[in-house]
Amino acid sequence: MYDVIVVGAGWCGLAAAKTYLQTCPTARLLVVDGDSSIGGTWSKERLYPHLVAEAHYGLFEFSDLPMRREGILPDGRIPSAAVHAYLTEYATKFGLLPRIRLNTWIEDIRQDPTAIGDDKAPYWTLQVAGSSQPLQARKLIIATGLTSEPRMPSFPGREDFEGHVLHSKMMGRADTGKLLNDPSIRHVVVYGGSKSAFDAVYLLLRAGKTVDWVIREGGGGPSIMTPLNILGQPSFRLNNSRVMSLFSPNPFEVAGERSWWQRVMHQRAGTFAQLLVVWFWRVLAYLLQRPWKYDYSVNGKQLKPILGLDSVLWSPATLGVMTHPTLWEDIHSGERVTIRRQNITALGQNKHVVLSNGDRITADMVVCATGWHARHSLFTPDEQLAVGLPSTSSFDPKSQAHWLNLQKAADEEILEEFPLLQNCPIALPPVRCEDDHHLYRFVAPSSGPLAQERLIAYVGFLRTTGAPIVYEAQSLWATAYLTGALHVPALEEREKEVARTNAWIRRRYICGRKVPFALFDFLPYVDMLYRDLGVNSRRKKNAVSE
C-alpha cells in the first residue's frame, strides 16, 4: 500500500512527486508511467528529428534547476533531446528515479467505498495492463495532463486502405522512423492544423516526402503561429510577462480587491476602454502574422487565421511558436506541399483519401495531428463525474439541474463583469454540464465524497504557455490540499467558483470550449494559487520588473 501514487512521469508528474516528497519525505510514493522513459510528451519514444520546444532557452525550466547550455541551438531554441535530458537530470537531482516505475500502463482506477485499509481509511486500486497484481494507494495525483490520450478520427473505409495511418504522437517511434526512411513511402497526407501538424509537415518534407496538408473546414482553423522573436525578444518571453494579462479580462483576482486597471479596463469597460483592449490584441496579431505573408501564395492563404486580426484575442485555434521558420519557404513555393481546407470523409482502396469536396488523394501514409481527448479513460464514465472530469455519462437529474443552474448564473455573471466578452464573434454552442472539468482551482474535485476526504488531486489540467511555472504552483497547492494543510472554502463557494471559471474560459477563449485554457492569464492564476497558500508570488523590486 502506497501513501501516494502519481500517474504520469512528465513535467507535471515529476513536479508533483518532488514537491510532495519535500513536504513529506517519509511518504511511500510511487510514480507510474506507460512509456519506457520519463518525460511524458518529451519521453524518448516521442522525440523525432527536428522537434524543438516552443519556449526559448531560460524559459522552459523549473525554478530550482537551471537548464544546461549544452545542446541548445545558437539562437536559443531547445531541441527535444535537451528537454528530455533536463527532465532526467531533474528526476536524478531530487531522488525520483528509484520511485518511478516505467512501462506501467494504468488501465483502470477505482475507489471502492467499502475498501478500507488497516488504518480504516479508504484507498484506491489501480489496475495495471498485463498484470494481475493491482497497485493500491491512499491518495492519487493524476499528472497525465491534457496531451496523453490521442484523438484519432474514425475514418469509414479504414480497413480497405492499404497505407499507414498514425497519430502525430507516434512520430518518434522507431517503426515510424523506418517509414520515414522507406523510399516506397513517397506521398503523405497530414490531417490537422495544430502546432503538431506544422512539425509533422516540416519533418516529412525534410525526409523527402510530398505532402498534402488537409485542415478541417468548419473548425477553429490552423494554429496562430508566432515568430521566434518579436520586438527583439523571444516571443515566448512576451507571453510569459504580465503585460499580456493586463489586457486580458480574467477572474483570478480577489473580488473587491481588483487593481484599478482591471476595474477600469475590464469591469467598467466603456467604449473607449474596450477599443483600447481590442486594438492592443489587433496590433499584436499584426506583428505576429506579418512575417508569414499569408497572401503571398495559394498555400499561404489556406493558413490564415479564421478571425484575421481578432484571432489572437479570441483564440479560435491554439497559439504556437514557429520553431522552423524556413517551412514557410516550402509552403509558399508549393513544390512539395499542397494545403487544402477540407474534411477527410473516408479512406479507401488503392490508397485513396476522400475529401469532402469529392477529391481523391493517393497517399502512402496518413498522419493525424488531430489533438487529444478531453476525457480520461483511467476512470469509467460514471467515475469520471465523481472525480471531477468530463464524461459521456450524465449526472442524476437533481445534480444535473443543480449544475445547469450554476452554469447559467455564472455565464450571466461573467458577461456582466467583463462586458468585452459579450462580443465574441463565434456564438457559444449548447453546453452539457457533464462536459466541464469540475475541478476547484483546476486541481481538486469541487464536490462529492472525494472532495471531502481529499483523496485525489490533479496537476496539468489547465492548458497554458507557462508550463513549469504553473506545474510548480499546482504541485504545491495539491500537496497542501492532500495533506490537509490548505483551507478550502465551503462546498457552495467551491461549486460557484468552478462554474464561474468554466464560464469565463468558454467566453474568453473559443478553443477553451474543448479543454480548460488560460493562454494569456496564467500568471494571475498562479498568483491566485499562491495567495491561497499564503505565499507572495510578486517578489521583484517594482511593478515594472514584475
UniProtKB/Swiss-Prot annotation:
Summarizing the function annotation, the protein's role is:
FAD-dependent monooxygenase; part of the gene cluster that mediates the biosynthesis of the tetrahydropyranyl antifungal agent lanomycin that acts as an inhibitor of CYP51 and blocks the ergosterol biosynthesis.
Q: Which Pfam families match?
A: Pyr_redox_3
Q: Which sites bind FAD? A: 106
> Which segment of the chain is annotated as a signal peptide?
1-17
Q: Which organism is it from?
A: Pyrenophora dematioidea (Helminthosporium dematioideum)
Question: SUPFAM superfamilies, per this entry?
Answer: FAD/NAD(P)-binding domain
**Gene expressing this chain:** ORF4
GO MF annotation terms = monooxygenase activity
This protein is called FAD-dependent monooxygenase
Q: Where are the glycosylation sites? A: 239, 343
